[in-house]
Amino acid sequence: MLAVALLCTAPLASAQQNAVALNPAIDMPGYLRVAAEAAKYRETRRLSEDEFIRMSREPGTVILDARSREKFDELHIKGALNLSFPDIAVDSLKNALPDKSTRTLIYCNNNFLGAEKPFPSKMASASLNISTYIALYNYGYRNVYELGPLVDIKASKLDFESATEAKPNPPRPQLFLF
């Protein structure tokens, strides 16, 4: 029986070793291990809208939005910091969140209804919250909490802003007609 089990798992182990050997900078088995560990940790870190608001007001808390800069500029939770998911790396995290113990609140497209342009829905299994949580966990950030519910943006208690609201419009050039 043991011999059969070893024969069945040998090709899988060999395929994983070959994948890492082809490109040691890409480690799917390692990612899956971290994702499973992060999933267990995440279970107790999903917040209601009220909890998210309360925690966001406490000193030293950062709200992180990992959507693209374009979508962030269209609309985001007031006071959020933008670090687009593709840019999450050692150096960008050191700049944005230098202290790994900083309480970090995250949210994504799939948390909001009623604003499809700035918050386009993704497949539930491809939710940006999941990817962001796993990435932060993988980089050693453990004080991360996630907005849990699907919130109607028109009924939300959260404060939102856009880049145009956050910054004054530049003065218009004056036209002189002679």
Q: Where are the regions a protein language model picked out?
A:
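Short, solvent-exposed loop/turn elements at domain surfaces
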Residues: 54, 71-74
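Cleavable N-terminal signal peptides
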Residues: 2-3, 13
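A short, well-structured juxtamembrane/interface segment
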Residues: 41-55
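Rhodanese-like catalytic fold shared by cysteine-dependent sulfurtransferases
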Residues: 14-43, 73-77, 81-83, 88-178
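Short hydrophobic beta-strand that contains or immediately precedes a catalytic carboxylate
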Residues: 62-67, 80-83
